[in-house]
Amino acid sequence: MSKKKEKKFQESKISTRSYRSTTMLRHQIRRITTANRLLDELKTSKDIEKFLNNSTWSIKELLQQPLTNTTTKEVSSDVVTKMLKLSGLSDSQDIQNIRKSLNLQMMFINHLYDKSGNNAEKKVNDNNCMFRLLASDHIPQRPLDLDTLMDEINKLEPSEEKGEIGFGIKDLQRDSFVINKK
């Protein structure tokens, strides 16, 4: 940092992190060719710092219950009980709170993956296939022993589909180096 910038930095009495943020933002603003209202408001470093420190939205806004119940599908207590059994956790007496928090998490995840970008309409996705639980998914596999592992290694062959192309000595000799056998 030059002495002139350092003096200006000390006079402004802002933190190093804020200074870096404002400097980066200032450089980005200079690059923008089209003007808008936001650029007119952000002229000084104090304006930029004030803008960066003010939040414009909250996660709590996204976690509100949907306005309409026509397309919503909530997690039932049976699903929560099944998830607790399959996870190996003890059956909790507080299933209603777990169900409520799972519904909120699903609503937030659906908001993150909402492709329409319409935040005003809060709805829960009907596609529950992401959250299905099958007992067959949790069957442990047979343990791998040394003999089985050695057999699988011996059976390996290069796969052209995966881009594993084998080569021989003849292919190596086309390059600029030579292999001498003794």
Swiss-Prot record:
InterPro entries: GatF. One of its GO terms (molecular function) is glutaminyl-tRNA synthase (glutamine-hydrolyzing) activity. This is Glutamyl-tRNA(Gln) amidotransferase subunit F, mitochondrial. Keywords: ATP-binding, Ligase, Membrane, Mitochondrion, Mitochondrion inner membrane, Nucleotide-binding, Protein biosynthesis. Subunit of the heterotrimeric GatFAB amidotransferase (AdT) complex, composed of A, B and F subunits. HAMAP family: GatF. It is found in: Mitochondrion inner membrane. It catalyses: L-glutamyl-tRNA(Gln) + L-glutamine + ATP + H2O = L-glutaminyl-tRNA(Gln) + L-glutamate + ADP + phosphate + H(+). It comes from the Eukaryota.
